[in-house]
Amino acid sequence: MARRQATTKKRRTSTRKKKPTVAAKRQMTGNVIGLIGLLVTILALLKVGLVGMVFAEFFRAIAGNAYQIFAGLTLLVMGYLMIFGRWPRLTWRWWVGGNLFFFSYLLLLEIPMFNQLNHHTDFWSLTWNLIKNDFAKGGMASNLGGGLVGAAGYSVTYPLLANVGTILIALILMVASIYITFDLPFHKTMQALRQALMQLGQQLRSGYEWLTHVLRVQIARWRVHQQVRANQAASTEKQPTSTVPQSAAPAETTSGTSAPDSAASAVTSSPADLNITVASDREASPIKSPTSAATVDHEQELQGTEVMDDADYQLPESTLLTKIPKTDQSAEYATIESNSQKLTTTLASFGVQVEVKNVSLGPSVTKYELHPAVGVKVSKVVNLADDLALALAAKDLRIEAPIPGKSLIGIEVPNKQISTVSFRDIVEAQPAHPTKPLAVPLGRDVSGNLVVADLSKMPHLLIAGSTGSGKSVAINVMITGLLMNTKPSQVKFMLIDPKKVELGVYNGIPHLLTPVVTEPKKAARALHKVVAEMERRYELFADSKQRNMQGYNQYIRQQNAADGQSRPVLPYIVVVVDELADLMMVTSSEVEDAIIRLGQMARAAGIHMILATQRPSVDVITGLIKANVPSRMAFAVSSGTDSRTIIDSNGAEKLLGRGDMLYQPMGMNKPLRVQGAYISDHDVEEVVNFIKAQQTADYDDSMLVKDDETDAAGSGDPRDGEDEYYAEAVELVTDQQSASVSMLQRRFRIGYNRAARIVDEMEERGVVGPSEGSKPRKVYRQKSADEAPASGNDA
């Protein structure tokens, strides 16, 4: 019972109050201090009575003219302290950054104050005296600048750095305070600033282009109007048989003969195009003064009657082309840093240490240039292409290892947002090359730089790519680029289009030697006519003892200046074949022979070829054609085999299509990736119609292919497909009364394919019979009566 009572006895509780803890006392103290500080700050801001003036002078002594900002910040801090009983819990970045920014602001306030007072020493004492004077007068009339805090900083910076240095120090401290406060990475800030400046620059550039476009159009119209009036006056006042006065009259006016060219150059874009105007002025000067013709630059392709024919010809303006708005690729900039990190991390996981040295954002791909660590094999990076594509979630990527001329490895990653390269933009950005009439812009490389191809340096170009890869657009870009840079007397075209739908739009322009050739048999004959023209030109070179077309044209100019005649100079000839595979299927031997001869000898004669095909197989692009066409342009293909057929290396199978190409001109070891320019069919028609409105087509009768010529080729004309050994082979077979391919190979020392074609041709013409397996062919042609005794005597 005693134990039970002990357990049920109630425990006594103390009724005394607990003493306040240390935290509660601290919070109460904070509340009181906050209340007092809040009251003092309010009195200072409102300047209530003498007490308020005293408190206001206290804040002015510290912060000077910025005392209201200082008091406002103090009010916020004291209000927080009064409510929560503790100081605001801010990180050290906010405290340090905020105080540093406010100090920089006070330092800037000191500069106008002391410049106004013209006082440059003892800044602290002067500020303190001004504060005492205001306090004694009971007012705030004096300019205190940045107060005692600002005066303390100014007394250090001014003797060392003067006012300019003080301003720079203050601005640097402000920027540093922002970085400290918000913990901003420097490279991200610079990248954001760069994007903002680029957008601003693009807007300013668009406005400037619009304004200059309007001015150029008005100036061009005025110049063309003046030129028309000058030409009308010259044609009515001067005799057509007098060459010198006809060119002298326009030269006396301000616009002169160069007005059409200068008008075109004024509209086409860049300030460098003004060089074309100078070149046009030189073209008029030899006619005005024949004695000065020997000093004319060799690039002038028009003299005598040709200059008079082209005097009114105006080059097409870039305003005829559609202006495509630029694509916003700001999202691509945002992914550059993350992709760079993914590349280094992925390669590091495979034991390959690299460092991203440079990144180039192009129209269709972004190129990351990596520097491998010492001991890293290049092949190891190349073998990880699929793993890198997986890490970047890319469709496909191309690795250039190493980059020519650099100790870096290039990784080209496709962009999610592809920027279209406008043909008008690259035409306006192309610098003027009066000495390079065959220079045409192709597009832009992965760094955004303009890529210009010079046909005279190539000298022949092979284009290959699958359907829809941009091959036909590239051909239109090159042809239109030549039409916009040259006159009909400078460049002539031979266009061959077996598909009949790609190049037909150019029919009727004065630059054509013949209408667009669409039949394969006529195309083979047309190529042989170009070969004949090449041989004719070499005969002219031999007679004049010149080595190439430029030297011959210069020689003709000198002769014209000496005797007053007007001998024509030779224009460039550009042969364009849009589908080589179709020609090789129908007339392979004739086409191949003509292409090989032109490839070997046509450069010095001023004849250049552009061959395009969508089937880059070895039976179309034969070894002889590849050997004689050194410059290549590969678009997207289906396999690495096709890529190796075009450019002798892989890479074209990884292209994106839509103008993405690998361009390898003669002399370049590795191909250059280029995003080709885009030109619409409407733009091509606009340029063609502009040219047709000025001149009509004047075809060369010697280059026209007639129907009877193709019929003669089918009947066995030796110049149109019959082998040169055919007649001798017929005599041999008739004499021996047996026919075999091996016999022709041994006797004429020719290859199997050629000998087999001769035997097949004899079979078609009824000379020999068909093949009967292992039995010899029957010979239908018998020896004549005169041949039989002769052969018997020989035996």
Curated annotation (Swiss-Prot):
Indicate the transmembrane segments per the record: 32-52, 64-84, 94-114, 138-158, 160-180
What are the subcellular locations of this protein?
Answer: Cell membrane
Q: What's said on domains?
A: Consists of an N-terminal domain, which is sufficient for the localization to the septal ring and is required for cell division, followed by a linker domain, and a C-terminal domain, which forms the translocation motor involved in chromosome segregation. The C-terminal domain can be further subdivided into alpha, beta and gamma subdomains. The alpha and beta subdomains form the DNA pump, and the gamma subdomain is a regulatory subdomain.
* Binding-site residues, ATP: 468-473
**InterPro entries, per database record:** AAA+_ATPase, FtsK/SpoIIIE/SftA, FtsK_alpha, FtsK_dom, Ftsk_gamma, P-loop_NTPase, WH-like_DNA-bd_sf, WH_DNA-bd_sf
Compositionally biased tracts (Basic residues)? 1-20
The protein's gene is named: ftsK
Q: Where does this protein have compositionally biased stretches of type Polar residues?
A: 231-272
Pfam short name (any one) = FtsK_alpha
Q: What is this protein called?
A: DNA translocase FtsK
Functional note: Essential cell division protein that coordinates cell division and chromosome segregation. The N-terminus is involved in assembly of the cell-division machinery. The C-terminus functions as a DNA motor that moves dsDNA in an ATP-dependent manner towards the dif recombination site, which is located within the replication terminus region. Required for activation of the Xer recombinase, allowing activation of chromosome unlinking by recombination.
Q: Which GO terms describe its molecular function?
A: ATP binding; ATP hydrolysis activity; DNA binding
Could you describe the subunit structure of this protein?
Answer: Homohexamer. Forms a ring that surrounds DNA.
Concerning its family, UniProt says: Belongs to the FtsK/SpoIIIE/SftA family.
